[in-house]
Amino acid sequence: MSNLRTLVFFATPAHDCSYIPGRQATTMFVDPRAQVDKRLYSQLTSLGFRRSGSHYYRPHCEHCNACVPVRLKVEDFMPDRSQRRVLKKNSDLTCRMVTASFTERYYDLYSRYIEQRHSDGDMYPPSREQFTSFLVEGATDSWFLEILDQDQLVGLAAVDKLDEGLSAIYTVFEPSYEHRSLGTFAILWQIEEANRLELSYLYLGYWIAECRKMNYKTRFQPIEALRDGHWQVMDQH
């Protein structure tokens, strides 16, 4: 089994940034031949890495540090008025955690979400292979949060369990349920689940000040950012 001392990393060639127009980005990847167990994955996450399928990566741009890893210390979180409304609005839904896997039911929801919400992104068009390589392959202690309206699957969130927290990987929802704010609801549920499991953190990936679609992450307070190798509460002013 690999460890931090023996890991080999690779950097991609510069490519167009997916988040900030006109910028070039470089990504650092863990050697895909490395054997990454839950303990090593947890260490990598605390250093700002993310998982996408069987790949572990973090931004490694020469002249830009806009991508900031963020996490929430769940025991300090108190929902604001808007988040309490989201919880109340979705109190009729059922949530359950199941082992991450491919099913046509999951893929149907995923494909509708990508086609109707992200047709201008690099995940379009969706495919079964894409779903599997992104959300199922490489899983260590990986789960899907099913969000159900009676028997209808209306939301699906990929969640990894780490040594000290949960990592929110990706969430999709039924486009016709947009008014339910299921993305926010999924995060609120994961916060509650982390508390129930007596875990300290919910990792929310990267926050980019110039990317409006990531603004929602800073609505969960107090949020911590990894800067200069140290996690610290993010100053919102």
Predicted stretch roles:
Residues 2-34, 39-50, 54-74, 149, ...:
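Conserved donor-binding loop and adjoining core beta-sheet/short helix segment
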Residues 47, 188-201:
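Conserved acyl-CoA
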Residues 52-62, 72-179, 219-220:
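A conserved beta-strand-loop-helix scaffold within acyl/acetyltransferase catalytic domains
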Residues 58, 68-75, 201-237:
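Active-site/acyl-donor-binding loops of N-acyltransferases
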Residues 110, 187-190, 217:
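Residue-level preference for non-acidic, small/hydrophobic
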Residues 166, 174-180, 199-201, 206-210:
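Nucleic-acid nuclease catalytic cores
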Residues 179-191:
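Conserved acetyl-CoA-binding loop-helix of GNAT-fold acetyltransferases
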